[in-house]
UniProtKB/Swiss-Prot annotation:
The lineage of its organism: Eukaryota, Metazoa, Chordata, Craniata, Vertebrata. This is Protein farnesyltransferase/geranylgeranyltransferase type-1 subunit alpha. PFTA repeats lie at residues 112-146, 147-181, 182-214, 215-249, 255-289. It comes from Rattus norvegicus (Rat). InterPro entries: Prenyl_trans_a. It catalyses: L-cysteinyl-[protein] + (2E,6E)-farnesyl diphosphate = S-(2E,6E)-farnesyl-L-cysteinyl-[protein] + diphosphate; geranylgeranyl diphosphate + L-cysteinyl-[protein] = S-geranylgeranyl-L-cysteinyl-[protein] + diphosphate. Transmembrane segments: none annotated. It is an enzyme of class 2 (transferase). It comes from the Eukaryota. Residues 41-51 have a biased composition (Low complexity). Keywords: Acetylation, Magnesium, Prenyltransferase, Repeat, Transferase. One of its GO terms (biological process) is positive regulation of skeletal muscle acetylcholine-gated channel clustering. Its cofactor is Mg(2+). GO terms for molecular function: acetyltransferase activator activity; alpha-tubulin binding; CAAX-protein geranylgeranyltransferase activity; enzyme binding; microtubule binding; molecular adaptor activity; protein farnesyltransferase activity; protein geranylgeranyltransferase activity. Residues 19-32 have a biased composition (Pro residues).
């Protein structure tokens, strides 16, 4: 029976037993040379972990299985139930089975204790993607009134090791909600994005923080900086759309013109950048591609020196929009669109030639005068 956050007081099971007495200390080692002392200190630092409160790593040679610990003798472990006839059963390590058998036991008892809290840490070290462990850890954080700033330090280390794990980012989000303090978030996320600027978990968290705490100031400047570093980063173009949509919007003609010209300048830098073309289409499509003043002429001027499949496809979209809006020179516009579809099929986007020929046939079928449609169509 899974525990839920904020349900009840401490469950039966009592407080953990007394820890085992440590063995007598070994005799002092022989004197070390300065270099040896430095190496030993570095090794000690490497073995330490965030929130080091007596936690013993699963990789430690002195690690003791839970089933062999006196303070856990009152708990009957709960094995994983894979059903009567498991297929392709996972072969877990002895440590993994031991930790999760005891985790299932404390979860079943809804035991809100310090030992249960430490157990979640072992379980997370073995599988940080287990959302049930994270959920129960949050239950214990509240029940035991743990220091949430210490927990933030802990989750920072986990995210740095596993930056593309849904559960660790969700845990951080809950902590920020509880603390009502986003002061570390934008800088922390920027550090993660410096390692991988397309980490959508980090972007999702950034969007939530900005929207939840109204941190819109300077975000567009941050986006500009990242686009200068990598104009092809679709995640950053998406962030640009997110920021403007939630602040000024695109209804203001000055904002829209600024964004159109900004995007065209980025396209001039890298003509074959699909991300920029998608952004341009996204901000104009609902307003009518053919209705934006002078856009068609600007793209036609770009075509000789900055031609790409995306530019030609965009021209097809503009011509189609003109046909849909009953332009005066319908036959001429249709012929231009059909010619571009054939250029895409034969030269610029040959891998999708059948798609572009289908688009051409569709345009011809829809917008040709009935007497002009070939019998085969």
């Amino acid at each position: 029976m899974a525990a839920t956050e904020g349900v009840g007081e401490s469950a039966p099971g009592g407080e953990p037993g007394q820890p085992e007495q440590p063995p007598p200390p070994p005799p002092p080692p022989p004197a070390q040379q300065p270099q040896e002392e430095e190496m030993a200190a570095e090794a000690g630092e490497a073995a330490a972990s965030p929130m080091d409160d007596g936690f013993l790593s699963l990789d430690s040679p002195t690690y003791v299985l839970y089933r062999d610990r006196a303070e856990w003798a009152d708990i009957d472990p709960v094995p994983q139930n894979d059903g009567p006839s498991p297929v392709v059963q996972i072969i877990y390590s002895e440590k993994f089975r031991d930790v999760y058998d005891y985790f299932r036991a404390v979860l079943q008892r809804d035991e809100r204790s310090e030992r249960a809290f430490k157990l979640t840490r072992d379980a997370i070290e073995l599988n940080a993607a287990n959302y049930t462990v994270w959920h129960f850890r949050r239950v214990l954080l509240r029940s035991l009134q743990k220091d949430l700033q210490e927990e933030m330090n802990y989750i920072i280390a986990i995210i740095e090791e596993q930056p593309k794990n849904y559960q660790v980012w969700h845990h951080r989000r809950v902590l920020v909600e509880w603390l009502k303090d986003p002061s570390q978030e934008l800088e922390f996320i920027a550090d993660i994005l410096n390692q991988d600027a397309k980490n959508y978990h980090a972007w999702q968290h950034r969007q939530w923080v900005i929207q939840e705490f109204r941190l819109w100031d300077n975000e567009l400047q941050y986006v500009d900086q990242l686009l200068k570093e990598d104009v092809r980063n679709n995640s950053v173009w998406n962030q640009r759309h997110f920021v403007i949509s939630n602040t000024t919007g695109y209804s203001d003609r000055a904002v829209l013109e600024r964004e159109v010209q900004y995007t065209l300048e980025m396209i001039k830098l890298v003509p074959h950048n699909e991300s920029a073309w998608n952004y341009l289409k996204g901000i104009l499509q609902d307003r009518g591609l053919s209705r934006y003043p002078n856009l068609l002429n600007q793209l036609l001027d770009l075509q000789p020196s900055h031609s790409s499949p995306y530019l030609i496809a965009f021209l097809v979209d503009i011509y189609e929009d003109m046909l849909e809006n009953q332009c005066d020179n319908k036959e001429d516009i249709l012929n231009k669109a059909l010619e571009l579809c054939e250029i895409l099929a034969k030269e610029k986007d040959t891998i999708r030639k059948e798609y572009w020929r289908y688009i051409g046939r569709s345009l011809q079928s829809k917008h040709s005068r009935e007497s002009d449609i070939p019998a085969s169509v």
